Amino acid sequence: MQLVIVAVGHKMPGWIETGFSEYAKRMPPELRIELREVKPETRSSSNNAATVMQREAARIEAVLGSLSKQCRIVALDERGRDFTTVQLAAQLTDWQREGGDVAFLIGGADGLDPALKARASTLIRLSSLTLPHGMVRVLLAEQLYRAWSVTQNHPYHRA
């Protein structure tokens, strides 16, 4: 099973790339994390938030089109479901049992287009706080690693 993080944004600071890479490399080969970046759309007087989200959604859809048809889509959204670490670990186990890859969608500054959120099988949120988009990549990778460590009784997670 592959975990694909599809994130709007590119040219992240080095510390973001380092943090993401650190957790991605800790994952076992059978549960690899891959990052696919999508170019953000610039907001202007002729590009309102809805237009920006639609254009970014088209780019995200292009990435999703390159993935398996059975790929499960999970959208990160401020109104998504809260998961505890143990709940995320259980969900990860369920996804592994069901087979297929999982794509996690991280929107741009204006969020994800409503059509993408509707297409997702699950909406989750990492925090009630507003987080920088680059940091969300690092936090998601860390939480996926932590969830995996729970399933393996690895000492990384001590709760």
From Swiss-Prot:
Keywords: Cytoplasm, Methyltransferase, rRNA processing, S-adenosyl-L-methionine, Transferase. InterPro entries: Alpha/beta_knot_MTases, RlmH-like, tRNA_m1G_MTases_N. It is an enzyme of class 2 (transferase). Its EC number is 2.1.1.177. S-adenosyl-L-methionine binds at residues 76, 107, 126-131. GO terms for cellular component: cytoplasm. Gene3D superfamilies: 3.40.1280.10. SUPFAM superfamilies: alpha/beta knot. GO terms for molecular function: rRNA (pseudouridine-N3-)-methyltransferase activity. The keyword Cytoplasm applies. It catalyses: pseudouridine(1915) in 23S rRNA + S-adenosyl-L-methionine = N(3)-methylpseudouridine(1915) in 23S rRNA + S-adenosyl-L-homocysteine + H(+). Disulfide bonds: none annotated. The keyword Transmembrane does not apply. Specifically methylates the pseudouridine at position 1915 (m3Psi1915) in 23S rRNA. Belongs to the RNA methyltransferase RlmH family. This is Ribosomal RNA large subunit methyltransferase H. It comes from Cupriavidus necator (strain ATCC 17699 / DSM 428 / KCTC 22496 / NCIMB 10442 / H16 / Stanier 337) (Ralstonia eutropha). The gene is rlmH.
